[in-house]
Structure formats: structure tokens, C-alpha cells
């Protein structure tokens, strides 16, 4: 099956979050299953064509009469980079700079989507599925129906629109409609109007043939007023077309048996290397090397979506136990100072590294005994799956993908982690204390570790589910 996959970021070339991970991995997994997949994304200013190994593409591609240059990264699922010096090439941030969105994001991503829809005709492709991701590509289904209705390259093509995070909706003043080349008739409540603004996210939800999001539980949550970000009524109307498909993880980049970031390697059958990773982590972050003390890890944005307010509130009571805490992250300056101060006040119990370090993120996953993810909401989440693969027991709030990937320990021989439901510091503390109590039972803890490491969270599993959905749309 021919598939055109469109995303505003594609790892490793451009990435601000989970979308970049998905766009970098899912098309490759689909290609490995025998599908013909092409990916379309902007050539952001941070991408050096020469350093990235991109090749120029000779094409007659145009968007609204304007010639468009194109680059390609060859591979099983070739990635086409759309060039536009003003809209993409001269920007530092993908979506904004200095904490503010770029003022022309509507024009930027309308241009990307139009370029993606014009690309099959220019390159001789005949995709049966257009897989469009997040608000940046939300105009795609409408544009396919109204600007490409007679395009032979897209004849019979069906659209899949994936919600990676419903909280980001692509909202713009209605006055941008003429600049986008959209008729005023789309500015209706049953189309793209959203509280007197233009919503790219709503456009995708209203007009795509199928909707997906990144976990089954998140798919249910966004049907409710509490989780639907004011789009729940539309989503309930489209509930039959909404599918929750879990993201996967890159099991090659995240493999404790081969990870180049680790000082020692290990498997479920031989955990000696994990003990060595724990000691090395304690040394690296300046904590006493004490193998008998449980280490709780966090790799996170310091933002309330991630439940960091719960961690901050629960930390004093947690430190009443004999435990060490290692945190890596950045975000809200107030929380940065909270954890930096905790590290200063408890230098033998707390280590806080403000910023991001890919290698240290891997070493925390490998060296910690448990991993805290008390998110307020979490469409999918990746770190809990990394933790399972690295034998690090997750303590999670049972929302979104966390609920779908972590089974609560039953006290005997089932479960892969510890879950809680209420969004309170006490609920987090109770779940963490459960984990610390079980940590002292080496046999029960070993069972938790081994069951977690046996979980299949590969992209192969996710790709099979997407492929099954595609075939219901384009048999």
C-alpha cells in the first residue's frame, strides 16, 4: 500500500516532542512491513542539507503558483523536505522563539500541507492513504476534498488524522482566512470555527476519514468534557471513526543489552549490569553509592502537565524514607529552583540536573530502580516504556497511555508497576511507598522487573495496527 505521511517535525532531523519520535519511526516500521511510504516535512532552518545527507530533487512542484524546492533523504521510507526560505529556512524554533509562537504559523503550515498534497502529482506517486499529524496538518482533509478533487494522483485517497496532543489546537484569528486562500464558508461551527477563531485541529477532526490518537485510554478521555479541550462534542460525534493506537519505542536505540550510553549492559536473564549502572549513576550525579537504597528517577519537562507539582509537594515526605531521587529536566523556572534547592539541602539524597542530556536520560533509565510519572494527562508517554524495557519499575498516574502500558502490581505475581488515580500528592506518595515496600522483597521485585522487560512496546506492533486501519479505509 502506498502511504503519504505528513508531519511538521521528523526525528532525528527536527524534534520537539513525541510527534517527532512518531514521524521518525512509524513510517520506517510501515515500510519494513512491505508498504511504500513517503514522508513530507519542512526543511527547518536547523537542518543542514549537507550534514543531514539530503539530496536535491528535480521537480515541478508548485504551491498556489509558487515553485517549491525539495530535498530528499533516501531510505526505505524516503523523507522529503519542503524548502521555503522565508517560512521555514530562516527560523530557529520550529514553532516559535523566546516562548512566543511565530506570527505566521497559519501560513507556514497551510503551505506545508498544500506542498504535501501537490507532491504525489509532481513525483508520480499514487498514495491510497494520506496520514496527517496534529494541528499543523489539520487543513489536509478539507484541501484534499476541495482543491484536489480532480487530481488523478490522489484519486480515491483516504485521510487519517492523528491527534498527538489535543491541548495544542492551532488557533488563529479568522482574519487570516483570505491569506490562506480559504473561503469564508469554512468559518462555521460545523467546520473550522472554534470560539470565533480558526482551528486547524478542528478542521482535521471534522473532515478526515478516520481519526486516531496515541493510546486507547486517551481516545476515551478526549470524549469527555474534562479531557476534550472543548472539542469533546465533535469527537463524540465522530466516535465511531476514532481509534486509539499506542505509540511504540525505538527498541534499537533503547536496548539495555547494547545501549552505547551505558557503562554496563544487561538483560532480563542477567541483571548484573543493571546493578553496575546503578552504582555508576550514583557516582555520576554525586550521590553515595549504596546498592541497598532504592533510586527513584525522573526525566521530564518541569511542567504541571507532567505532574511535577505533585512531585514537589510529595518530596519532603518521600525523603523521610531511605531513598535517593535523581531528576533530569527543565521547564518552569520555579520548579527548576525547587529541585535545585532540594539537591542543595539533601546532597546525599537528591540530585537535580537542569537541562537535557540524552546520555544521562539513558543512564537514569538503566540505573534507577523506579521511575516516577505522575502526569495530569499523558496522551501516550514514552519514558514508562523505556523504563519497562530497562527493568526500572514505573510509578504512574493511571491516565492516557500510562494506563495502557503499566499494569498495577497485584501484590503477588501480576503487574509491571504501580498506579494511582487521584491527582494529589498523597496518592503519588502512597503509590511510591507501595513500590518502596515491595523493593525490600527481592523475589517480588525481580518478578516486576522481568515482567516489565518482557513487554512488547515495539513500533512493529503499532505499525501492524495502523496498517489494519488503513486497509479498512482503502481495501
Swiss-Prot record:
Pfam families associated with the record: Glyco_transf_5 (PF08323), Glycos_transf_1 (PF00534)
Domain of life, source organism: Bacteria
GO cellular component: cytosol
Signal sequence coordinates: none
GO-annotated biological processes: glycogen biosynthetic process
Catalytic activity: [(1->4)-alpha-D-glucosyl](n) + ADP-alpha-D-glucose = [(1->4)-alpha-D-glucosyl](n+1) + ADP + H(+)
InterPro entries recorded: Glyco_trans_1, GS/SS, Starch_synth_cat_dom
One term of GO molecular function: alpha-1,4-glucan glucosyltransferase (ADP-glucose donor) activity
Residues annotated to bind ADP-alpha-D-glucose: 15
Described function: Synthesizes alpha-1,4-glucan chains using ADP-glucose.
PANTHER family referenced in this protein's UniProt entry, alphabetically: ALPHA AMYLASE DOMAIN-CONTAINING PROTEIN (PTHR45825:SF11), GRANULE-BOUND STARCH SYNTHASE 1, CHLOROPLASTIC/AMYLOPLASTIC (PTHR45825)
Name the UniProt record assigns to this protein: Glycogen synthase
UniProt source species: Anaeromyxobacter sp. (strain K)
Lineage: Bacteria, Pseudomonadati, Myxococcota, Myxococcia, Myxococcales
Gene: glgA
Amino acid at each position: 500500500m502506498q502511504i503519504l505521511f505528513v508531519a511538521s517535525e521528523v526525528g532525528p532531523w527536527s524534534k520537539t516532542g513525541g510527534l517527532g519520535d512518531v514521524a521518525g519511526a512509524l513510517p520506517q516500521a510501515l515500510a519494513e512491513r512491505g508498504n511504500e511510504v513517503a514522508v513530507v516535512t519542512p526543511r527547518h532552518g536547523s537542518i543542514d542539507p549537507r550534514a543531514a545527507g539530503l539530496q536535491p530533487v528535480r521537480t515541478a512542484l508548485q504551491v498556489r503558483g509558487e515553485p517549491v524546492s525539495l530535498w530528499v533523504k533516501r531510505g526505505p521510507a524516503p523523507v522529503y523536505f519542503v524548502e521555503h526560505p522565508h517560512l521555514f529556512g530562516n527560523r530557529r524554533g520550529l514553532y516559535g522563539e523566546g516562548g512566543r509562537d511565530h506570527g505566521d504559523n497559519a501560513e507556514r503550515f497551510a503551505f506545508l500541507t498544500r506542498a504535501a498534497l501537490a507532491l504525489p502529482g509532481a513525483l508520480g506517486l499514487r498514495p491510497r492513504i494520506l496520514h496527517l499529524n496534529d494541528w499543523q496538518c489539520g487543513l489536509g482533509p478539507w484541501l484534499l476534498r476541495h482543491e484536489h478533487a480532480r487530481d488523478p494522483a490522489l484519486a480515491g485517497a483516504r485521510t487519517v488524522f492523528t491527534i498527538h496532543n489535543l491541548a495544542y489546537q492551532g488557533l488563529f484569528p479568522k482574519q487570516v482566512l483570505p491569506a490562506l486562500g480559504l473561503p469564508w464558508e469554512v468559518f462555521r461551527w460545523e467546520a473550522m470555527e472554534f470560539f470565533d477563531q480558526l482551528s486547524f485541529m478542528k478542521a482535521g477532526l471534522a473532515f478526515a476519514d478516520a481519526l486516531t490518537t496515541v493510546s486507547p485510554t486517551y481516545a476515551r478521555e478526549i470524549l469527555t468534557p474534562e479531557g476534550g479541550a472543548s472539542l469533546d462534542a465533535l469527537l463524540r460525534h465522530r466516535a465511531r471513526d476514532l481509534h486509539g493506537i499506542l505509540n511504540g519505542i525505538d527498541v534499537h536505540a533503547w536496548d539495555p543489552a547494547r545501549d552505547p550510553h551505558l557503562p554496563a549492559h544487561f538483560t532480563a536473564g542477567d541483571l548484573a549490569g543493571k546493578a553496575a549502572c546503578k552504582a555508576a549513576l550514583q557516582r555520576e550525579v554525586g550521590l553515595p553509592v549504596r546498592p541497598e537504597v532504592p533510586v527513584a528517577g525522573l526525566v521530564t519537562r518541569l511542567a504541571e502537565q507532567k505532574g511535577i507539582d505533585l512531585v514537589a509537594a510529595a518530596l519532603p515526605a518521600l525523603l523521610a524514607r531511605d531513598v535517593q531521587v535523581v531528576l533530569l529536566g527543565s521547564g518552569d523556572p520555579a520548579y527548576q529552583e525547587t529541585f535545585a534547592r532540594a539537591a542543595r539541602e539533601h546532597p546525599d539524597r537528591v540530585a537535580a540536573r537542569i537541562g537535557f542530556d540524552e546520555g544521562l536520560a539513558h543512564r537514569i533509565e538503566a540505573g534507577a530502580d523506579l521511575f516516577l510519572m505522575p502526569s495530569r494527562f499523558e496522551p501516550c508517554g514514552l519514558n514508562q516504556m523505556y523504563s519497562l524495557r530497562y527493568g526500572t519499575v514505573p510509578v504512574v498516574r493511571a491516565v492516557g497511555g500510562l494506563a495502557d502500558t503499566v499494569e498495577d502490581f497485584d501484590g503477588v505475581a501480576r503487574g509491571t508497576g504501580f498506579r494511582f488515580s487521584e491527582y494529589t500528592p498523597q496518592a503519588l506518595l502512597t503509590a511510591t511507598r507501595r513500590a518502596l515496600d515491595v523493593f525490600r522483597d527481592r523475589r517480588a521485585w525481580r518478578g516486576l522487573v522481568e515482567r516489565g522487560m518482557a513487554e512488547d512496546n515495539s513500533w512493529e506492533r503499532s505499525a501492524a495496527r495502523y496498517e489494519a486501519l488503513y486497509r479498512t479505509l482503502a481495501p
